[in-house]
């Protein structure tokens, strides 16, 4: 973990915001500080405290059982019972039942540049929550590129470039840089947009220079009554219409990043987490994301544009407990912290439960042996076999 932070160029934090969406907490990203990690680094976890308490209780129980054996069968029997009770009361693998899962998770998080802020972070990252996803989470900067453009109608390419870029600039999102590139190539200029509207179904619209302008997917244009010739039907493209007439088809290339795909798959696979889409790019529809990332989108929430704008304005509380830290901006760095925390907590609690049951059962067996005086059962092979059963 320290090595991960040492190599960090940028440092982000992961915090939990209560009542973020429909009375459910949201997991937000903010600015991180190394002190947030150091404050929790050496704190003793709940499972470690339980392990220490059980070790003390098992020591007292072993002494009591050996005292009983001494009273019934003499000092030699008491020594045998004490030494064996200490072995079976705490199965050998109990000492790595907490550290081994933590080490495996730390190694995995190191690969994506993330650390969890102690057991506090593990515990608070568990439970049901919504995870807001933005344009840069799905398609980081540089992965969305212009793949060609074809103009239609009587309007000039320079005018079309200015109109489309202006509307995209008003909408925001991952397509802004793409249309800025188109605008620069055509030496156009940004124009004021009136009555901007995000339809929330794969398209946007507005009034520019008195003309109604629509930008959207093929399905959106057809739903809006814009005539689209058969030869222009491209799935991954932005269609532009001015005054109800198709004027351009801008082909867009979306490169699928491995980190984004891995993060989204891991997020959807977790039943306690709900992906909340706050993207501004109207191309990122439910069907497009499902096809692009090969995932089932029924658990993804696509709120209306008003809700998206309101939630996008919510920032991480600087006074909130920092639960994890990331040194990268990709989706996997954040999601692996959240899903890994749940897996680690389950593994630690299950490991504690199994080994405590094994230890208590071992003490009960030793109590019976001490009472009956059956010292012949306390052979190295029998003790080894018992240890192996609980590993």
State what each model feature region is.
Residues 1-130, 325-391:
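Hydrophobic alpha-helical transmembrane segments
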Residues 13-28, 130-224, 242:
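Cytosolic catalytic regions of ATP/NTP-dependent phosphoryl-transfer enzymes
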Residues 18-27, 208-210, 242-381:
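Conserved ATP-binding TGD loop and adjacent catalytic N/P-domain core of P-type ATPases
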Residues 117-119, 192-193, 263:
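Short beta-alpha junctions and helix-cap segments that line functional grooves
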Residues 125-128, 200, 232-234:
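Short, small/polar residue-rich loop motifs at catalytic or cofactor-binding pockets
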Residues 179, 217, 236, 263-264:
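Residues within well-ordered alpha-helices
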Residues 223-227, 259-261:
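A short, polar/proline- and glycine-enriched secondary-structure boundary/capping micro-motif
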Residues 230-239, 272-273:
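Helix-loop-beta junctions that constitute the ligand-sensing/allosteric loops
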């Amino acid at each position: 973990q320290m090595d991960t932070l040492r190599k960090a160029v940028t440092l982000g934090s992961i915090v939990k915001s209560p009542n973020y969406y429909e009375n459910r907490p949201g997991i937000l990203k903010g600015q991180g500080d190394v002190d947030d990690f150091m404050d929790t680094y050496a704190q003793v976890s709940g499972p470690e405290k339980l392990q220490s308490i059980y070790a003390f209780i098992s020591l007292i129980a072993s002494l009591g059982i050996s005292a009983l054996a001494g009273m019934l069968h003499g000092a030699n029997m008491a020594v045998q019972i004490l030494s064996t009770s200490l072995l079976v009361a705490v199965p050998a693998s109990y000492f790595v039942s907490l550290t081994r899962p933590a080490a495996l998770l730390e190694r995995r998080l190191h690969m994506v540049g993330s650390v969890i802020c102690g057991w506090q972070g593990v515990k608070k990252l568990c439970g049901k929550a919504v995870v807001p996803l933005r344009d840069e989470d799905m398609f980081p900067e540089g992965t969305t590129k212009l793949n060609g453009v074809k103009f239609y109608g009587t309007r000039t390419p320079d005018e079309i470039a200015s109109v489309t870029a202006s509307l995209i600039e008003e909408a925001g999102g991952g397509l802004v840089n793409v249309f800025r590139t188109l605008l620069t190539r055509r030496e156009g200029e940004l124009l004021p947009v009136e009555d901007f509207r995000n339809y929330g179904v794969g398209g946007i619209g507005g009034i520019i220079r008195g003309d109604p302008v629509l930008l959207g997917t093929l399905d959106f244009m057809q739903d809006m009554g814009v005539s689209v010739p058969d030869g222009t039907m491209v799935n991954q493209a932005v269609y532009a219409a001015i005054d109800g007439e198709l004027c351009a088809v801008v082909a867009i290339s979306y490169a699928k990043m491995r980190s984004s795909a891995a993060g989204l798959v891991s997020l959807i696979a977790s039943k306690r987490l709900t992906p909340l889409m706050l993207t501004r790019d109207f191309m990122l529809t439910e069907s497009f994301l499902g096809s692009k990332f090969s995932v089932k989108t029924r658990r993804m929430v696509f709120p209306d544009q008003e809700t998206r704008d309101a939630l996008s304005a919510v920032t991480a509380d600087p006074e909130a407990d920092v639960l994890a830290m990331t040194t990268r901006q990709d989706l996997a760095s954040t999601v692996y912290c959240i899903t890994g925390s749940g897996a680690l907590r389950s593994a630690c609690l299950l490991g504690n439960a199994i080994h405590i049951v094994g230890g208590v059962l071992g003490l009960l067996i030793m109590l019976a042996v001490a009472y009956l005086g059956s010292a012949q059962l306390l052979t190295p092979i029998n003790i080894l076999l018992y240890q192996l059963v609980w590993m």
